UniProtKB/Swiss-Prot annotation:
It comes from Dictyostelium discoideum (Social amoeba). SUPFAM superfamilies: Proteasome activator. It comes from the Eukaryota. It is found in: Nucleus. One of its GO terms (molecular function) is endopeptidase activator activity. PANTHER family: LD45860P, PROTEASOME REGULATOR PA28. This is Proteasome activator 28. One of its GO terms (biological process) is regulation of proteasomal protein catabolic process. Belongs to the PA28 family. Keywords: Nucleus, Proteasome. Subunit of the 11S REG (also called PA28) proteasome regulator, a doughnut-shaped homoheptamer which associates with the proteasome. 11S REG-gamma activates preferentially the trypsin-like catalytic subunit of the proteasome. May also be involved in cell cycle regulation.
């Protein structure tokens, strides 16, 4: 083969098909999935803050009425039980974090495959693509870390319960346990707000720059709407 001849490799049809599938899923997420999630988590954050009367918040409110004195008077067999509402809410957050990671990984995958070949000249659209990929990657890392650290509450509570069982006369451990549980309920409210906020800010960034993400070099780009 002559040194002047270069090998031409065309994009495989399966890869193009996969890219098109990611594009369709991306548009669906931007038009349906993400706006729905923003509204859902906004409402959940509000209901936790206002102690609304729905079933979940009714249970939560009931549990939150237990102040530090209740923990001091509570029988040991009840004290060592993990709060059922907290356990159930942890499972809901785990599901929510996984859904967020999956949703934005699809969008990140499509943007990555849609980056054009490297050329001299105007690469502003490509820079936008790379910046948004970076933002999405950071968001995924945040929620991956939250998944990994979700057991920290249970570990802290278990440690305090062990101390309570060993030192039944020291009320300070019971007060500490009350604070750990109350702190977890408070964190839930902020966590729902953070989910809504992170969905909204990332969604806004993507939609505002969608023309450059879809067609990074030509100026006659289309819009998802």
């Amino acid at each position: 083969m002559s040194k002047n001849n270069s090998t031409v490799i065309k994009m495989d049809e399966q890869v193009l098909k996969y890219k098109e599938d990611l594009y369709e899923k991306t548009v669906h997420h931007l038009k349906v999935t993400i706006p729905k999630k923003i509204a859902e988590y906004q409402e959940l954050a509000k209901s936790y803050g206002q102690n609304s009367e729905n079933e979940q918040d009714g249970q939560t409110s009931k549990k939150r009425k237990l102040d530090s004195e209740d923990y001091v008077l509570m029988p040991i067999e009840d004290l060592i039980k993990t709060n059922r509402v907290i356990m159930e809410t942890h499972q809901k957050f785990k599901k929510a974090y996984i859904e967020l990671i999956e949703t934005f990984s699809v969008i990140r995958g499509w943007i990555s495959l849609n980056i054009p070949r490297i050329e001299d000249g105007n690469n502003f659209g490509v820079d936008v693509q790379e910046d948004i990929i970076t933002q999405i990657t950071k968001l995924e890392e945040v929620y991956t870390s939250l998944l990994d650290g979700s057991e920290s509450y249970f570990a802290s509570r278990a440690s305090l319960v062990k101390k309570i069982l060993k030192h039944k006369d020291i009320e300070a451990y019971r007060y500490s346990l009350a604070q750990v549980d109350e702190k977890e309920f408070t964190r839930f409210s902020f966590s729902y707000f953070d989910l809504a906020n992170n969905y909204a800010t990332t969604y806004s960034l993507i939609v505002k720059n969608f023309a450059k993400l879809e067609t990074p070099r030509p100026t006659n780009a289309s819009n998802i709407y």
